[in-house]
Amino acid sequence: MPNSMSMTIWRRLIVTATAVLAAALLTPAAAHGAPHDSRAPRESRPVYSYADAVRESVWVDTGLDGDGDGRTDRVAADIVRPREPALQGRKVPVIMDASPYYSCCGRGNESQTKTYDAAGHVVQMPLFYDNYFVPRGYAFVGVDLAGTDRSDGCVDVGGRFDVQSARAVIDWLNGRARAYTTRTGTTPAKATWTNGRTGMIGKSWDGTIANGVAATGVKGLKTIVPISSISSWYDYYFAQGAPLYDSGPDWLSDYVESDTARARCAAEQRKIVAGAPRTGDWTPFWTERDYVKDASKVRASVFVVHGMQDLNVRTKNFGQWWDALAKNGVQRKIWLSQTGHVDPFDYRRGAWVDTLHRWFDHELLGYDNGVDREPMADVERHPDQWTTSATWPPRGTAATTLRPAPGSASGVGVLGLRPARGTETFTDDPSLSETDWAARIDRSTPEKAGFVTGPLGRDLRIAGSSEVTVTATPTTATAHLSAVLVDLGPDTIRDYGDVDEGITTLADRTCWGASTAGDSSCYKETAAKTKAVDSTVVSRGWADLGDWAGDGKGRPLTPGKAYTITLDLAATDHVVPKGHRLALIVAGTDKDLIDPPSSTPTLTVDLSRTSAKVPLVGGAPAFARATAGSAGGAVGATAAVTASDAASASAPAAAVESASRGVRHEPAVHRLPAR
C-alpha cells in the first residue's frame, strides 16, 4: 500500500495510463482478474479509466409521499461507473453509500460534500470508494436520503422514508422500480449497465441505513459494511429510559433537511416529536426503527466495524445486532478498534482498503480469495496493535456471574464469585463521571459503590456484552443508575475522549485510487493520538430505575421500596492484564453520558441481589485462576466454581457455538490483511 505522496502520485499516473491500454486488450474475464485458472489473480485490478467514467444522476421513485404534495417522492442517486464494461457488453456490481450528509455536513475526516458541474452531473464524490473501486470494475452510487440535498420527501430519522430511499434504489438496480433522468421529468432511466449485485457501506447514519435496508430482506443486496452504526434508534437516544442526549430525533432531522424539505415537512416533524417523547418510554416510533427485531430477514453478509470507545453510537448497537445476526446464521466479519466514532480509513488505512477490497471482490464479484476463511474478528488490543480471533466472541467464552461483597470501608468492596450479604449506599452526583469514580475506587466516597478484585495473576479477557442486575432502594421518586466495568492499572490507550476521538490528522497525504481535476483520491494521513491512564473503562450501561418493570414504560418510584433492574452493558473485547485489577462500579448519573434525573436520590444497594454477568473467555474457571491468591476477589473463588461453570469453559458455550453458525471455519494457516 502507498506510504508517501510522491510515490502514490507516480503510481497513480502509471496505473491510469496502463488502464486505458489494458481495457482495450484484456478480455472481460481477465479485466476483472477472474480466477479461471490457478495462475489468475484473485482480486479485481484497476484496468478501467476513472477519467472517462460515466457520471450521471437519476431520480428513483420511492413509491411514498412523505411531504404530502400529492406526488410520490423521488430520491437522487449520483452514479460513477466505468465506461468500458458497457461497451464490452458486461454488467458491473454496485457499491452504494446512502447518506443524509452529502450536502449539509460532508463525509469523512475532511468533511467532503458532493459537487456538480453546470449540467448537474457529480464532479466530486466524497470518500475514496469511487476513486478506488470504479477502475476495478465497480459502479459507485451515492444516494441522497429523502428530504436531503436533491431528493424529495422528508427526513424521518431511520424510519420508512429513510430506509425506502435506499431500498428503492436497489430495486431500481434490479429492474423492480422506476427512475427518471430528472427530478420532475418523465424520461425513464434504466439500469442496464449493472447486474444488480449491491453492497452498501457507510459510517454512522449511512451505515445505519445499510442495517435498516438489510433488515427488509431486499433481493440484490449481497453485503453491507456498517461502520459505527445504529441497530436500534431507541438505543441511540435512550438507555432503558435514561436519556443519553438533551435532544431528540426532531433536532437531527431538522439539522440535515434541505431548505426545500424543511418548508414542507412540518407535519412530519410533529410526528417525530410526538413519537419520541423525552420520557424515554418505548413507542411504535421506536419499534419501526428497531432493525434488530428483523435480523431473521437479513440475506446479506455483514462486515461490522465499530470503535469500542464510541460514545456517539454506543457499542450496545453493534453488540445486539451482532448477536441477532449470529442467531440467524448470517455470514459476518468484525473489526473492533480502540477509537471513538472514527472510520477505519483513518486509523488502519492500508489494511482497511486491502480488506474491504477483498471483501467486495468476494461478495460482489464472487472471487474465492479466502477472505471468508480468515479469522472472523480483528481487535485493536493497544494503539496500532491488532490481534485476531477465529470466531467472535471466541470459543469458550461464557457468561460468568460476578458478585459484589462488602469490603473494609464503605463503598470499597470486593468482586468475586460467591454471593454475599450486606448493603452499600451512594448519592447521585451529576457533576462526576465514570473516570472520576475510577480514580477514587480505593477511597470511600459518597457518589459510588465500587467492587474490586485483587491484582490478577494472569490475563483475563472480556469479549461480548455484559449485564448488571442491581437491587436498589431510592429515597426519591426518580433515579438513574450507571454500571461500569473498569480495568484498574496503568496503560497507554487511544485518547477517545479527545475531540478527534483517538486520531491526529497529519499534513501528508496518500492516494487511494485514481483522481481527476475535480475529485482527488489523496487524503490526509492520520496517526494514533494516545494518552497515559491509570484506569480504563471498558464497558458501560445506564438505566432509569423507573423502568424496572422491563415493559418500556417508566413509572414513579416509591421512596423506601426496593426495585430490581438489569442494566445492559455495552459490547467490548478487552484483556485485563496480569497485575491489573477488575472493578465493577455502581453509581448514579454518569456525567456527560446520561442526563440526570429530576431529583438527587440516595440509593441503597442490596448486595445479595446484585450481580454482573460478564462474558469471560474461559468462563468462571478463568476468573478463579486469574484471581487465585490475590486479595479480595480470590476469597473463596475457586470453591465457588460449579461443575457447569467448568464445563462451559472446557467446551464451546452454546451461545458461542451459535455465534459461529453461517461462517466458514478457517484453515490452519490464514492470510492476514496487509498492515
Language-model features, listed with the residues they occupy:
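Catalytic-loop region of hydrolases
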Residues: 32-119, 126-129, 139, 198, ...
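C-terminal, loop-rich substrate-recognition/catalytic regions characterized by aromatic stacking residues
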Residues: 39-44, 347-636, 665-675
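Secretory targeting and sorting signals
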Residues: 1-34, 634, 638-640
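Conserved alpha/beta-hydrolase "acid-adjacent" motif
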Residues: 311-317
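Catalytic histidine neighborhood in serine/cysteine hydrolases
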Residues: 325-342
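A fold-wide structural signal in alpha/beta-hydrolase
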Residues: 94, 134-141, 333
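Accessory cap/linker subdomain of secreted extracellular hydrolases
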Residues: 45, 64, 70-73, 106-107, ...
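Short beta-strand/loop motif that positions the catalytic acidic residue
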Residues: 298, 304-306
